[in-house]
């Protein structure tokens, strides 16, 4: 009888484990190497380069940057509050070149929670009001019949709701309704995995905070819908959508237990795929690295409801400098076929150059022009050969033959003989 009881207890434990998404420990040296990639970014303290996501996710990781971390938060507060509050009721933006977007404001609010702060006082109320106005504007753009689109994206819409929820600020039911409608199975459009994951995190925060009680049943159903969508999006290799949407998807799945072994199995498979991608050097972009670090520490944005600011974290040390090797010259073909006349040119650059380096060299050679805009994930193209991307258009990067690139112009490094195409596409 005692053995039967022990067996039933063991089966119960295994069953409970199967219901949750757990990521087994990853080699600490690999995690530290990832964190070291962020240190140079933390020296970039201009408003254009400040990235609240770096601070948030470092605080949720097992790593710390000491005084560099403190200076970064101070610079965030100085830059964001002066820029956003200084221009809140004025047309004069002063030194605010590249004023933070509302998505960046939402991330800034997450950064405050990561430091165990709530927005308070007159300044805090203004920031909250700005974010609420942004959500109201997006709600109107979507329309009463839901046939419109947000000016930014449903990703930023969900991020805005999440940020307010983490600061215990309620949003109107009608604002939540737009995100619920977009993610419900009968009338949802095509939303990326990271958009679904961000919406799922927002819904999870609302549910755990007991906000919008009149929508509780729909919120619970939406969490289930998002979980099903993400699990169905798992690739044969194990990624959810693609390698770069997997960390945020895992953040959501870690907050969303379900009966049976499917969830646990899917998360273990994703861990194997992520580990392979890490070893291949796929994570070089600061934003992508920062979203991965909390997952490797078994943390999510939902932990910011009750953040632990006293948890021990390992001090990051700068990576040892490597002796530069003599670099060979490679040839990369750059082409733009979606414009008339088409452009096609072979460009010689150093091995290890990025697409951005190729674009700069093409511009120096003449006959090619382009413009970029800064974002939290790095620069992106807004104009090529004088043709600016219009509303709901963007300049896509492809590797011949017809393979869309997941990395941006500052991250992807073409190999010798590759052809890179810039294509204007609609979405």
Swiss-Prot record:
Gene3D superfamilies: 1.50.10.20, 2.170.130.30. One of its GO terms (biological process) is cobalt ion transport. GO terms for cellular component: extracellular space. Disulfide bonds join 21-267, 116-309, 165-205. Residues 1-18 form the signal peptide. Cob(II)alamin binds at residues 104, 152-156, 190-194, 242, 245, 291, 395-397. It is found in: Secreted. InterPro entries: Cbl-bd_prot, Cobalamin_Transport. Its main location: secreted. It comes from the Eukaryota. Keywords: Cobalt, Cobalt transport, Disulfide bond, Ion transport, Metal-binding, Secreted, Signal, Transport. The keyword Metal-binding applies. One of its GO terms (molecular function) is metal ion binding. PANTHER family: TRANSCOBALAMIN-1/GASTRIC INTRINSIC FACTOR, TRANSCOBALAMIN-2. Primary vitamin B12-binding and transport protein. Delivers cobalamin to cells. Interacts with CD320 (via LDL-receptor class A domains). Belongs to the eukaryotic cobalamin transport proteins family. This is Transcobalamin-2. It comes from Pongo abelii. The gene is TCN2.
């Amino acid at each position: 009888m005692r053995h039967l009881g022990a067996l039933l207890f063991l089966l119960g434990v295994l069953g409970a484990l199967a219901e949750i998404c757990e990521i087994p420990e990853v080699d600490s040296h690999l995690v530290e190497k990832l964190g070291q990639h962020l240190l140079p970014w933390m020296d970039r303290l201009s408003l254009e380069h400040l990235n609240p996501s770096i601070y948030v996710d470092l605080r949720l990781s097992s790593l710390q940057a000491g005084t560099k971390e403190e200076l970064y938060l101070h610079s965030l507060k100085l830059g964001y509050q002066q820029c956003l509050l200084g221009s809140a009721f004025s047309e004069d933006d002063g030194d605010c070149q590249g004023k933070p977007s509302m998505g960046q404001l939402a991330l800034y609010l997450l950064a405050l929670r990561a430091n165990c702060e709530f927005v308070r006082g007159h300044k805090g109320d203004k920031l909250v009001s700005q974010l609420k106005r942004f959500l109201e504007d997006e709600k109107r753009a979507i329309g009463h019949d839901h046939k419109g689109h947000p000016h930014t994206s449903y990703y930023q819409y969900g991020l805005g709701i999440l940020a307010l929820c983490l600061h215990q600020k309620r949003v109107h039911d009608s604002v939540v309704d737009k995100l619920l409608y977009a993610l419900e199975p009968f009338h949802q459009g095509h939303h990326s995995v990271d958009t679904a994951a961000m919406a799922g995190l927002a819904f999870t925060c609302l549910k755990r905070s007991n906000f919008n009680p009149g929508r509780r049943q729909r919120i619970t159903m939406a969490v289930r819908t998002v979980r099903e969508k993400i699990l169905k999006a798992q690739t044969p290799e194990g990624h959810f959508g693609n390698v770069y949407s997997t960390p945020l998807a895992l953040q959501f799945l870690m907050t969303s237990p379900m009966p049976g072994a499917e969830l646990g199995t899917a998360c273990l498979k994703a861990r194997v795929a992520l580990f392979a991608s890490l070893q291949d050097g796929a994570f070089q972009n600061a934003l992508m690295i920062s979203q991965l670090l909390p997952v490797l520490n078994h943390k999510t944005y939902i932990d910011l409801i009750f953040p632990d600011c006293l948890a021990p974290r390992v001090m990051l040390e700068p990576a040892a400098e490597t002796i530069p090797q003599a670099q060979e010259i490679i040839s990369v073909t750059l082409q733009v076929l979606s414009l008339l006349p088409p452009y096609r040119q072979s460009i010689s650059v150093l091995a290890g150059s990025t697409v951005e380096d190729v674009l700069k060299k093409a511009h120096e050679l003449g006959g090619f022009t382009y413009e970029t805009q800064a974002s939290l994930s790095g620069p992106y193209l807004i104009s090529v050969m004088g043709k600016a991307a219009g509303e709901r258009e963007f300049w896509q990067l492809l590797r011949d033959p017809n393979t869309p690139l997941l990395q941006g112009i500052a991250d992807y490094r073409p190999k010798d003989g590759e052809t890179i195409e810039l294509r204007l596409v609609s979405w």
